[in-house]
Amino acid sequence: EDGHWVEISPMSIKREYDFDQVGHKDMYLLHHEEIESLALNIPEARRIRFFMTFGQSYLDHMRCLENVGMLSTSPVDFEGRQIVPIKFLKALLPDPASLGPRTKGKTNIGCIFTGKKAGQDKTYYIYNVCDHQECYREVGSQAISYTTGVPAMCGALMLLTGKWNKPGVYTVEEFDPDPFLEALDQHGLPRSESRTPVLVD
């Protein structure tokens, strides 16, 4: 915010938002890696935030596991061996790929922008709604994997077709977004847009 990193306690800022086709969900302010490159590449941005939704049951389970030490990354002695609790927990949990057939509902992933264009205040919301079961029917995975894989494929397509072509290492926001967004539209992640979204305080 205003050119400075702001640190807060984990999960301490919660907002409720009414997501198109998904409904009212609690979302939490947290760090995500794209914030870092956006802050570097768009220094005139006054504030960049990332919110993600979590259900109360998920949070309760995470707190319980944290309270008993199962989320620790520090090795502990167990029956004469050193184990890392969170790695042990991972070994007990189901393979995420096995959850595809049982995952139901939809994702809503988007960005809300506010700013000025030609001296006029503007607000713009671009988002995608993706159905878990439709994704599973198409590719055998749920929408979380789908909404991760399709943009990566579209980015590769931009490089292979020469639409994105600069020597060096760059992040997505450093290229022309239009052909990338068009590729997303064509390959299963069509966008929706709103000029009057509800803003998040």
Regions found by a protein language model. Name each.
Residues E1-D201:
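C-terminal catalytic/substrate-binding lobe primarily of soluble NAD(P)-dependent oxidoreductases
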